[in-house]
């Protein structure tokens, strides 16, 4: 998983469970939920990003080539 990857969410309690989002950034500092994922649709409170742990994500497409 790297910046720009398309990922499927595997966290059952998430609003975006089984949905696909784009990795916005990855924090290397050692925190548990280090991957920020951006989505096309917003959740109930109008937010379109969330932090996930790497083991809660399944990469479905690599980042687009520049």
Swiss-Prot record:
The entry's keywords: Membrane, Photosynthesis, Photosystem I, Thylakoid
Ribosomal protein recorded as keyword: no
GO cellular component: photosystem I reaction center; plasma membrane-derived thylakoid membrane
Domain of life: Bacteria
Secreted recorded as keyword: no
GO biological process assignments: photosynthesis
Membrane topology: Peripheral membrane protein
Subcellular location: Cellular thylakoid membrane
SUPFAM superfamilies associated with the record: Electron transport accessory proteins
Cysteine disulfide links: none
One Pfam family this sequence matches: PSI_PsaE
NCBIfam families (UniProt xref): PRK02749.1 (NF002745)
Biological function: Stabilizes the interaction between PsaC and the PSI core, assists the docking of the ferredoxin to PSI and interacts with ferredoxin-NADP oxidoreductase.
Family in the record: Belongs to the PsaE family.
Xref: PANTHER family: PHOTOSYSTEM I REACTION CENTER SUBUNIT IV A, CHLOROPLASTIC-RELATED, PHOTOSYSTEM I SUBUNIT IV
Protein name: Photosystem I reaction center subunit IV
Protein's organism: Microchaete diplosiphon
């Amino acid at each position: 998983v790297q910046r720009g990857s398309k990922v499927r969410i595997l966290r059952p309690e998430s609003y975006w469970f089984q949905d696909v989002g784009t990795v916005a950034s990855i924090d290397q500092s050692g925190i548990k939920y280090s991957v920020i994922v951006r989505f096309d649709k917003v959740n109930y409170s109008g937010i379109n990003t969330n932090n996930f742990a790497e083991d809660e994500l399944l990469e479905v497409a690599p980042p687009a080539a520049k």
